[in-house]
Design a protein with these regions (language model features):
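Alpha-helical multipass membrane-protein architecture
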Residues: 1-643
Length: 643
């Protein structure tokens, strides 16, 4: 692993003078094998990101896992394509994941307001968002990636490029992903998501004077997410859950005990306030306080973007139309952008239900907002990477503006709310695509790949991702609309979008709790805490955030066992591959299980006896930890022996 990128990749030279890693020979990395493998990876990352993101509220950028796994695939099936083939596979992986991380923020909200999603509607807004996002990104490609080389670092692009350059050291990536897939799949097979044979929730709840709840869902998928995102994010999310379950929940429980007889919960007249249990408090109160914190975080994030928006627009307008030394004509880019605009207007007419004025005004506003935030998203990716891109903040700001347009014109029916959210799904997809595009194209620039080839492969993967994500959401529709404290899919961002738009349109938003959440968010911001991360932890079940923290702790432990920097790098690569497998295996098997349950092929029985106890869940936890830690430690020993 002694190969490195040139130091010029990190700056010090003008972008037009940068000499890429590959300077001679064929600049194309694609062939039918690479395309097929990329489509498979796009489907895999799109489905697993949609499933895990709707459950945990977190999405994991696929660029680095895709680069590691892609290295193994190219080594096994397309050696001649080398590093440029690996580059295309990481880009296609990112394309599938990027679409999912955008669409799941808004599209499920249509279901949450009681409306239905047609496959055509979901496909149309997704395709329009992909094409428009890629099209606008190509217009600022030279400015963001070439002219700003060294000023915008694109940290995750550099990490992906370094991983690909040193890819001889990660030849075991496919093996570790396969092991992770197997572990995740087998455990998921026996839990509620499939056969429902064993309990995998460790649960301790107190319903007396000091009400609290501590739970851990033994989930390979969530443990894998925790390993990938690391300690800082996991700890902040868990802090939000601690605040919700051990401070705010007991406080509400204490004061509710003094409520008068006959007083009932505001949204559930069958439950007396003085008799509320932990689940009632979580579902009727904590949820809306959490939504307020998320709203606060989103608006603060949007406000902080104002200087970036101004800078981005100014520099984009003043940038040279074409930097010298860039390759190929922009013909394909213009076609993609034009197709995105045309499909956007056609989609606008379809989802507006025949309201021509709504279609014209809202599509125009959505295109303006999407264009603005696509530029901002591409620039911010150069600073913080796609993993930390404030997509939710930009989406909330956009939705608030579109909602105000709807209210101003009197478009306030439930059907209008559905149209509003579908326009929002278009905007968020375009915003997310900008991050995926600029990050993948920066890798191509650093390595010496073809710009047009990456655009083509990335766009195809993203369109495949749209089909996959919309199909996944429709298959899971019955599970996604379930409400309560212990639902399988918490949908934090989609719930926020539904609550926000429906509340503004109907005027029935529980403002008292929302404002409490907003004030808490401002308090977190003043303490310099990541508001949205803490807010998601507050909103999610503690069972979800606790196992994510366990995954981060496992990574911390594995890192501590490294005997050298090289050993640490090898363990990190192995751990990410294994974790990607855990996420993919659990998600795919979970999806298959739900499909089989819905179609009546399998009928899970009720868990009874020892299999239903906390002891059973603890045993599964022990097995999972022993397998993951044991495999990674053993791999570290083998790596050391090889050296």
């Amino acid at each position: 692993m002694d190969k490195k990128l040139s130091k010029d990749a990190y700056g010090g030279v003008k972008g037009k003078d940068y000499v890429p890693y590959i300077t001679s020979g064929d600049k194309l990395g694609g062939n039918p094998v690479v395309m097929i493998a990329g489509i498979i990876l796009a489907i895999l990352f799109a489905a697993s990101t949609a499933y895990s993101g709707m459950k945990s509220g977190l999405t994991v950028a696929a660029g680095i896992p895709g680069s590691i796994i892609g290295s193994g695939i190219i080594a096994a099936f397309a050696k001649k394509k080398g590093i440029l083939g690996k580059n295309l596979l990481q880009g296609m992986s990112a394309g599938g994941e990027t679409v999912a991380s955008g669409l799941i923020f808004v599209l499920p909200a249509v279901l949450l307001i009681g409306a239905k999603i047609s496959f055509i509607d979901g496909l149309a807004v997704g395709v329009a968002g992909v094409l428009f996002g890629v099209g606008i990104s190509t217009l600022v490609h030279d400015y963001l990636l070439v002219e700003e080389h060294g000023n915008l670092m694109y940290p995750e692009s550099l990490a992906i490029s370094e991983t690909l350059v040193a890819s001889e050291g990660v030849g075991d990536s496919l093996k570790f992903m396969g092991i992770g897939f197997g572990i995740g799949g087998v455990i998921m097979l026996f839990t509620g998501a499939f056969l429902n044979k064993v309990n995998n929730i460790i649960s301790y709840v107190n319903e007396t004077f000091y009400k609290w709840r501590l739970e851990v869902e033994v989930s390979p998928m969530l443990l894998g997410i925790g390993y990938i995102v690391g300690m800082e994010v996991s700890l902040m999310m868990f802090a939000g859950s601690i605040l919700a379950n051990f401070a705010v929940l007991p406080l509400i429980g204490y004061f509710s005990s003094f409520a008068a007889e006959g007083a009932t919960v505001w949204n559930n007249p069958d439950v007396a306030i003085n008799a509320m249990k932990v689940g009632n408090i979580a579902g009727s109160y904590l949820r809306y306080i959490g939504a307020g914190i998320m709203l606060s975080g989103g608006l603060i994030g949007a406000a902080k973007l104002i200087p970036t928006i101004i800078t981005s627009v100014k520099k984009t307008l003043s940038a040279k139309t074409a930097a010298k030394g860039t390759e190929e004509s922009t013909g394909m880019s213009r076609i993609i952008l034009l197709a995105g605009i045309v499909i956007s207007f056609i989609t606008g007419f379809v989802i507006s239900g025949g309201n021509i004025l709504m279609a014209l005004l809202t599509t125009f506003l959505a295109l303006i907002l999407a264009m603005l935030f696509v530029i901002v998203s591409g620039r911010l990716t150069g600073t913080v990477g796609t993993s930390n891109l404030p997509v939710s903040g930009m989406t909330i700001a956009s939705l608030v503006l579109v909602t105000l347009l709807f209210v101003g014109f009197g478009w306030v029916t439930p059907e209008n709310n559905k149209s509003l959210l579908l326009f929002g799904a278009f905007i968020v997809t375009a915003i997310a695509m900008a991050g995926g595009y600029t990050q993948s194209q920066k890798v191509s620039m650093l390595l010496g790949g073809s710009r047009n080839e990456m655009s083509k492969y990335l766009t195809i993967a993203s369109l495949v991702g749209v089909v996959t994500v919309v199909g996944t959401i429709m298959l899971l529709a019955d599970q996604l609309v379930l409400t309560g404290a212990d639902v399988q899919f918490a949908l934090p961002q989609a719930n926020l979008m539904a609550t926000l738009t429906e509340g503004i349109i109907s005027g029935r938003l529980p403002w008292g709790m929302i404002i409490v959440g907003i004030v808490m968010g401002i308090f977190f911001y003043l303490l310099k805490l990541p508001v949205m991360t803490v807010a998601i932890g507050f909103y999610l079940p503690i069972a979800t955030t606790s196992i994510i923290l366990v995954g981060a702790l496992v990574r911390k432990f594995i890192d501590m066992t490294a005997k050298s920097e090289a050993d640490k790098d090898a363990k990190l690569a192995n751990g990410i591959s294994l974790s990607a497998g855990l996420v993919a295996g659990s998600s795919i098997i979970g999806l298959v299980g739900i499909i089989l349950q819905v179609t009546g092929v399998i009928k899970p029985s009720e868990i009874t006896g020892f299999a239903a106890t906390n002891y059973m869940a603890w045993i599964i936890m022990l097995i999972l930890l022993v397998l993951v830690i044991g495999i990674l430690l053993r791999a570290g020993v083998k790596n050391a022996e090889k050296k």
